[in-house]
């Protein structure tokens, strides 16, 4: 390869990797998996090693990894948060150890072995015993200040038993069960699913709304300790010191005193990782002795004394038995793979989403071909590719459907979208999906009106649109004769339907199933327009000017209100007294501060309105003056006369950290 050819290829790879890095670190929505990213960056590294004169300071290989978002306040790290080099085989670990041995003088090096949590790196800064800041890694030099969100994580204490200035680093993550729960809720709400727990954790921690963060049970394992007043001799001592301060460490961390112990650790967790409650994508090995770490040193990007051993994705081969389409509530066609059952990452996989026709054609997937399958993020089944052997060429090339599988109408596809759509508003599959969506937990939340019950009611023609749900009481004699449905079940169903009439406007709006209007957008629209009539009369120009709406969504809303049957539906729902007025945000009546009164005084880390909003959303109240009936005085610096009066009346005075601890139930 000539230098000119290498230069062009290097530039192409850098552009591709920079785009992927933005998707991964900023948008939390990667378009490629880790294996593809790792393969491409190693290709770039190999080329730069061959042509070192082509290395530039802005190459992604010279960066730590992240990109700093402009959504949060910036924070410059006192000590750079470096990334780790990675390896994929035992031979590569042997080579890594030999490089370390050139400095230590022996290949019998002692390493700490730490499971590589698939999450988001975090730095916690404590001063005078109090958590001052929580900061993401960012680009390694500058991170994002996400302190308010970090304070909602139950495993991160707001105070520690030390007055020193201490920095503790670790990983914020979501457990497998919590990840599944969040994706289940997003599915019900019509939101895009998170691809893996790492994306979910990153997307959560970098939320602008800390109330959403608090609702998701983020967790954290800590592993790095910096304290200039109390230097630590080994990495394992560092972990024990973190534990002694009351922070959470991973109990699977071990010291490996020989290469044989390193190898056994790798083999054990390669086999057992699917049994853990959280996702890991490898193992981090660190030279245990801190003095030796400094002697071995650093590159501009990584420590030379640590390495990340990455697990290979478990890939299995199986037969692609069929490709079939399904119709969503908006008419979107999703293609699915029926697979010969195969065990992957601890579970049986017999189906996978194939997204859209372009996805299938790009991979040239054919029915009855042998395909490679893995689990993206060890969670979601994914068909990677077809095995193109001599039998493959004999199979017919797959062709996309041109008619809706439910109503036989011709499918349509716009030039700006990759998906096909059924545009028949009377399509039975769309109607059924829309009924299920309206009754779902994220929308009307009608208990007893699950998928099977709705399907039965629809098949019996007892309900044919959303408004018919509110006429179900008329069909009592038919419904109580359904299998597993008696008098009591019917009474409970009717009670839940009646209760749903009083739902918030945003829930009802979301339940209408307007294309692209998820639960968050529905809340934004409800807050701005206050009722359905104002929204109905909103122009495209008004809607598209809203930051979180944009042009595509604005057009979708305007188009929805142009359809006569949709206007009839709204009028009919109004006739059943379904609420279409914005009532304000719901309060958490089960909170630890519910019905408690607060006086806020002094200077706090956030504005007075910020704390007032939190208190009121948790069904507490903020009052202007201190009395004997006051439950708490939340006091910051320079609190003044209100603090003095609280002390005189023996009213409990709390600081900001104590406030969050009470809120978390500690």
UniProtKB/Swiss-Prot annotation:
EC number: 6.5.1.2
Keywords: DNA damage, DNA repair, DNA replication, Ligase, Magnesium, Manganese, Metal-binding, NAD, Zinc
Residues bound to NAD(+): 34-38, 83-84, 114, 137, 171, 286, 310
Residue positions of the active site: 116 (n6-amp-lysine intermediate)
Catalytic activity: NAD(+) + (deoxyribonucleotide)n-3'-hydroxyl + 5'-phospho-(deoxyribonucleotide)m = (deoxyribonucleotide)n+m + AMP + beta-nicotinamide D-nucleotide
Residue span(s) of domain BRCT: 588-666
Keyword Flavoprotein recorded: no
A cellular component term, taken from the record's GO annotations: cytosol
CDD domains in UniProt: BRCT_DNA_ligase_like, LIGANc
Alphabetized PANTHER family for the sequence: CHROMOSOME TRANSMISSION FIDELITY FACTOR 18 (PTHR23389), DNA LIGASE (PTHR23389:SF9)
Purpose of the protein: DNA ligase that catalyzes the formation of phosphodiester linkages between 5'-phosphoryl and 3'-hydroxyl groups in double-stranded DNA using NAD as a coenzyme and as the energy source for the reaction. It is essential for DNA replication and repair of damaged DNA.
Family: Belongs to the NAD-dependent DNA ligase family. LigA subfamily.
Name of the protein in its database record: DNA ligase
Species in which this protein is naturally found: Mesoplasma florum (strain ATCC 33453 / NBRC 100688 / NCTC 11704 / L1) (Acholeplasma florum)
Lineage, top ranks: Bacteria, Bacillati, Mycoplasmatota, Mollicutes, Entomoplasmatales
């Amino acid at each position: 390869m000539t230098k000119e050819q290498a230069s062009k290829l290097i530039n192409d790879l850098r552009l591709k990797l920079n785009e992927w890095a933005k998707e991964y670190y900023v948008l939390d929505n990667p378009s490629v998996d880790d294996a593809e990213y790792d393969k491409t960056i190693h290709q770039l590294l190999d080329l730069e090693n061959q042509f070192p004169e082509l290395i530039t300071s802005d190459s992604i290989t010279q960066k730590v990894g992240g990109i700093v978002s402009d959504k949060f306040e910036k924070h410059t790290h006192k000590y750079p948060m470096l990334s780790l080099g990675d390896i994929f085989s035992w031979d590569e670990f042997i080579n890594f150890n030999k490089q370390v041995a050139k400095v230590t003088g022996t290949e019998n090096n002692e390493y700490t072995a730490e499971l590589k949590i698939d999450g988001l790196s975090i730095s916690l800064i404590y001063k005078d015993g109090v958590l001052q800041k929580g900061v993401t890694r960012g680009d390694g030099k500058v991170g994002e200040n996400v302190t308010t969100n970090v304070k909602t994580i139950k495993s991160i204490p707001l105070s520690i038993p030390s007055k020193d200035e201490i920095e503790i680093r670790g990983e914020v993550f979501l457990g497998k069960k919590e990840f599944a729960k969040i994706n289940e809720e997003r599915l019900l709400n019509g939101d895009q699913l998170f691809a893996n727990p790492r994306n979910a954790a990153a997307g959560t921690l970098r939320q602008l709304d800390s109330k959403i963060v608090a609702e998701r049970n983020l967790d954290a394992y800590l592993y790095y300790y910096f304290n200039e007043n109390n230097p630590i001799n080994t990495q394992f001592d560092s972990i024990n010191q973190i534990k002694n301060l009351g922070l959470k460490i991973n109990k699977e961390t071990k010291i490996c005193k020989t290469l044989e112990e390193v190898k056994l650790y790798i083999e054990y967790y390669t086999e057992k990782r699917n049994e853990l409650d959280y996702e890991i994508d490898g193992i981090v090995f660190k030279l245990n002795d801190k003095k030796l770490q400094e002697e071995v040193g650093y590159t501009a990007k990584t420590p030379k004394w640590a390495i990340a051993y990455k697990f290979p994705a478990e890939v299995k081969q199986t037969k692609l038995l069929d490709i079939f389409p399904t119709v969503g509530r908006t008419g979107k066609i999703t293609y699915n793979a029926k697979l010969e059952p195969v065990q992957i990452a601890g579970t049986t996989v017999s189906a996978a989403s194939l997204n859209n026709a372009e996805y299938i054609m790009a991979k040239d997937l054919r029915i009855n071909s042998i395909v490679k399958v893995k689990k993206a993020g060890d969670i979601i089944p994914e068909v990677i590719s077809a095995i193109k052997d001599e039998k493959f060429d004999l199979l017919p090339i797959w062709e996309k459907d041109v008619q809706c599988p439910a109503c036989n109408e011709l499918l349509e596809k716009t030039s700006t979208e990759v998906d096909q759509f059924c545009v028949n508003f009377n399509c039975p599959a769309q109607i059924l999906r829309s009924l299920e969506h309206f009754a779902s937990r994220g929308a009307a939340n009608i208990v007893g009106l699950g998928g099977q019950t709705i399907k039965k009611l629809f098949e019996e023609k007892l309900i044919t649109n959303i408004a018919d749900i509110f006429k179900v009481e008329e069909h009592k004699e038919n419904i109580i004769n359904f299998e597993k449905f008696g008098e009591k079940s019917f009474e409970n169903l009717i009670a839940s339907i009646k209760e749903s009439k009083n739902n918030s406007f945003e829930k009802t709006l979301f339940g209408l199933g307007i294309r692209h209007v998820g639960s968050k957008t529905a809340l934004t629209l409800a807050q701005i327009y206050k009722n359905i009539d104002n929204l109905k009369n909103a122009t495209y120009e008004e809607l598209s000017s809203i930051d979180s709406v944009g042009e595509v969504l604005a057009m979708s809303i305007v188009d929805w209100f142009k359809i006569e049957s949709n206007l009839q539906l709204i009028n009919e729902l109004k006739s059943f007294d379904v609420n279409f007025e914005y009532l304000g945000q719901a309060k958490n009546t089960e909170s630890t501060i519910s019905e408690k009164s607060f006086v806020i005084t002094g200077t706090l880390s956030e504005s007075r309105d910020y704390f007032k909003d939190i208190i009121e959303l948790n069904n507490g109240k903020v009052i202007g003056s201190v009395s004997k009936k006051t439950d708490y005085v939340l006091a910051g610096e320079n609190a003044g006369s209100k603090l003095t009066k609280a002390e005189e009346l023996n009213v409990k005075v709390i600081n900001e950290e104590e406030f969050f601890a009470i809120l978390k139930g500690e």
